[in-house]
Each structure stands twice: as structure tokens, then as C-alpha cells.
Amino acid sequence: MSGKDRLPIFPSRGAQMLMKARLAGAQKGHGLLKKKADALQMRFRLILGKIIETKTLMGDVMKEAAFSLAEAKFTSGDINQVVLQNVTKAQIKIRTKKDNVAGVTLPVFESYQDGSDTYELAGLARGGQQLAKLKKNYQSAVKLLVELASLQTSFVTLDEVIKITNRRVNAIEHVIIPRIDRTLAYIISELDELEREEFYRLKKIQDKKREARIKADAKKAELLQQGIDVRQQANILDEGDDDVLF
């Protein structure tokens, strides 16, 4: 296993616990991001369907509004200059709200009429019915345009957030979690190797002690056979020397 495939960390019990905690955190984060991506995808598809529906309806409404304008011009003449000379302020205005979807803030636009219709009775003498129909149709068109702008803004915002979220999900799933897994496997293998080395070292110490005791006992027996009393002699094996480490 190359160093690039795992995190640079010294193998120890503490490092093993740390990697297990990081793995659990990465898996939990992956699950939460996956749920967020699914929620955003559902809202994205819903908005896409509304955009298609609104655009289809928008074509019909604009056709009706254009036809109403032609009727009003035919019955009342050119009313453009009259409207431009008498207009003071916009009666249809836009207000914004915020919608939250899985932690993502989406702007929502709404149209509303500010005050009463100043020109409600305008044109009654000549084609008043056509003018009223014209205003109604263009109000519907403006309302749909505002709704469409709101939907398309949310669509673009969600599209970008979904791409970022999916990149994060893929990074955690295919890079971070596998790297932590490999690091954890490396730590476990190194700790196992250290345990085997420690066991071998202790076994060698015990073997050397046993060999030394056997030699001492053989020497003692030989001295006893020669009639030498060794009970009062110091035994080097009884001394409290430190164990020899190999």
C-alpha cells in the first residue's frame, strides 16, 4: 500500500480510534448529503415540470394578450401616447420571499397591485370592453412572467447546488471513505505486526532465561558431584537484573 492511498499517520491504538471516529463521521456525512441531494432532486424535478407547464401556458396567454391589443387599437385607435403621457407609477410591483429547501435558500417572486386601478373607467366611450380585456390579459401575462422568472431562478440555483452536493457525495464515497478504510487497515496490520514482534521478543527472553537456568543447574550439579558446597554461593539468576531486550 503506497503512502498516497492512505493518510499519513503513525500506527497506534489512539490513531486506530481516531480513524474509526473519522470513518463513522464520513459515513454519517455521506448519508446526510445523500438525503439532501435526493430532496433537492425532487424539488428540481417539480420545478422543471412547473417551468414546462408555465411556458406552455405563457404562449397561449401572450397570444391572447397580443390579440387583445390589436382589438383595442382597432376600436380605440393608438392608445400608446395616451398611456405614456398619463402614467405616474407602476401599479403592478414585485416582492420577494425566501423558500428553504434542505438548507438551500431559493428566492420567490410575487406580483401584486399597488393601489387601485387609476384607469379603470378609461376608454368606456370607445372600446371600453376591449381595453378592460387588454388590461386583464396583460396582467395575467405579467403574473406568469414573474412566476416563470421565480421558477427559472430557483431552477438555476438548485442545479448549481445539486452539482456541488453530488461532487461532495462522490468525493466522500470514492475518495475519503476508501482512504480512511485503507489507513485503518494499515494501522491494524502494523499493530498486529508489532504484537507479533513483541510476542517473539518475550519468547526469546524466556528461552534465554530457561537456557541460562539449565546451564546453572548443570554447573551446580557438577560442583556437587565434585564435593563443592554451592548453597552459600551467589546465584546470578537470583539477582534483580533487568531483562535483556533483543
Swiss-Prot record:
Transmembrane segments: none annotated. It comes from the Eukaryota. GO terms for molecular function: proton-transporting ATPase activity, rotational mechanism. Coiled coil: none annotated. One of its GO terms (biological process) is proton transmembrane transport. InterPro entries: V_ATPase_D. PANTHER family: V-TYPE ATP SYNTHASE SUBUNIT D. Subunit of the V1 complex of vacuolar(H+)-ATPase (V-ATPase), a multisubunit enzyme composed of a peripheral complex (V1) that hydrolyzes ATP and a membrane integral complex (V0) that translocates protons. V-ATPase is responsible for acidifying and maintaining the pH of intracellular compartments and in some cell types, is targeted to the plasma membrane, where it is responsible for acidifying the extracellular environment. This is V-type proton ATPase subunit D 1. It comes from Drosophila melanogaster (Fruit fly).
